[in-house]
From Swiss-Prot:
It comes from the Bacteria. The lineage of its organism: Bacteria, Bacillati, Cyanobacteriota, Cyanophyceae, Synechococcales. GO terms for biological process: protein refolding. This is 33 kDa chaperonin. PANTHER family: 33 KDA CHAPERONIN.
Length: 297
């Protein structure tokens, strides 16, 4: 199943649902960064969460940043996701591996450890909206659900999953169910949803069973006037970094430091944190940057 996002409503518009398949883009992140099993799972869940949050934004070009700063072995992570379906991200210590949990699965909570989740929503103008919450357990899903409940006052359930073996990422994705204000006043509806979600066996198991997103939503909300909205949106791992952007970033070092790079290294090398692309700057390019800086001074 191709990476995609679908939206749906139920209960007369009182329930909002968004589902994403992120298998290929999670595999791409694993390949680009050389991620361990537990780092792949942590970043894969976080990228799915970022795309789910970005889906609620209205203005073209809007993006959501998720940053986790924590004390665990992974050292935190960063995700940048857009309404357009693009996402990128990285883990501070991508190669770290730890013992699996008692179920034999990657122990994301222990690998992340205690810390904070910072969420920034940027619509492309004005000041971005930012919010910070303490991590609940480092498993990503519960942490994002807590952010939604505390910062946006929206009762939400978020299911995130990544399944991988030694051949790579087999399945990844997520599901966000939100009870909107008009429906949140119906305790029976809220209780019914909570019961159904609690009985799900895990999102990745549903994907591995061969069910697609509409089928999963039908099982969960089909008797509540489920409506699938429009066509699926394609998703992909994408980083806008370029050689020219790298050269622009080098200017912040200033002319003296650039001269030092020429003298000591005969050029410069920069690696993009988000996609691990390596860029080289020649002596001639550094000299041109120095000239630009001195002309502007």
């Amino acid at each position: 199943m191709a990476d995609q996002l679908i939206r749906a409503t139920a209960a007369g518009g009182g329930i909002r649902a968004v589902g994403v398949i992120t298998t290929d883009l999670t595999a791409e992140a694993q390949r680009k960064h050389g991620l361990s099993f537990v780092a792949t799972t942590a970043l894969g869940r976080s990228m799915a969460a970022g795309l789910l949050l970005a889906s609620s934004m209205k203005k073209e070009g809007s993006r959501v940043n998720l940053r986790i700063r924590s004390a665990g072995p992974l050292g935190g992570l960063m995700v940048d996701a857009g309404l357009d379906g693009t996402v990128r991200g990285y883990v501070e210590h991508p190669a770290i591996e730890i013992e699996p949990n008692t179920q034999g699965l990657p122990d994301v909570g222990r690998a992340i450890g205690p810390g904070y989740l910072h969420v920034m929503r940027d619509v492309g103008y004005g000041q971005p909206y930012t919010s910070t919450v303490e991590l609940v357990n480092g498993e990503i899903g519960d942490d994002v659900a807590y952010y939604l409940a505390s910062s946006e006052q929206t009762p939400s359930a978020i299911l995130l999953g990544v399944y991988l073996d030694r051949q790579g990422v087999e399945a990844a994705g997520g599901l966000l169910i939100q009870v909107l204000p008009q429906a949140a006043r119906d305790p029976e509806l809220v209780s019914l949803l909570e019961s159904r979600i609690s009985h799900l066996k895990g999102f990745t198991q549903l994907l591995r069973s061969g069910k697609d997103l509409p089928e999963i939503l039908e099982d969960l909300l089909g008797d509540l006037d489920l409506t699938i909205l429009a066509e699926p949106r394609s998703l992909r791992f994408f980083c806008p970094c370029t050689h020219q952007r790298m050269l622009g970033a080098l200017k912040i070092f200033g002319a003296p430091e650039l001269r030092d790079m020429i003298a000591k290294d005969q050029g410069a090398e920069a690696t993009c944190e988000f996609c691990s692309e390596v860029y080289q700057a020649s002596i001639e390019e550094l000299e041109e940057l120095i000239s630009d800086l001195e002309t502007a001074a």
